[in-house]
């Protein structure tokens, strides 16, 4: 009996370790978000004077900005919802990542098609998860 009582504290210790690590990850992501914001501001400033023809790089950086933002929002939601990661935030991050991939690497039409199908699958999964939640609530 005494041996099992010691292991009852293990989940709490692991939860505390996870919380500390997520806190530092949120700080690092916040620093990267600020850095990305500065890069976007500089890019816009330079493009005003140089008349850049291609804005794919700018759009890619903007989507990276949103991915940092979504990861930070996911960590905030984790702490606000009693240490639970909502599924929809992972789907948002996945959709944003695939859209960035399509914008950056769109040379082959068939791969773009399959990436678009991946987005469609994530959207369908999102609606199924939301429908299940609304049925459970009613």
Swiss-Prot record:
Keyword Cell membrane found: yes
PANTHER family, A to Z: PROTEIN PSIE
Bilayer topology term: Multi-pass membrane protein
GO biological process, one term: cellular response to phosphate starvation
CC per GO annotation: plasma membrane
Name of the gene encoding the protein in the UniProt record: psiE
Protein family (similarity comment): Belongs to the PsiE family.
A Pfam family annotated for this UniProt entry: PsiE
Protein name per Swiss-Prot or TrEMBL: Protein PsiE homolog
Keywords assigned: Cell membrane, Membrane, Transmembrane, Transmembrane helix
InterPro entries in the record: P_starv_induced_PsiE (IPR009315), P_starv_induced_PsiE-like (IPR020948)
Flavoprotein in keyword set: no
Localization per record: Cell membrane
TM ranges: 12-34, 56-76, 84-104, 109-129
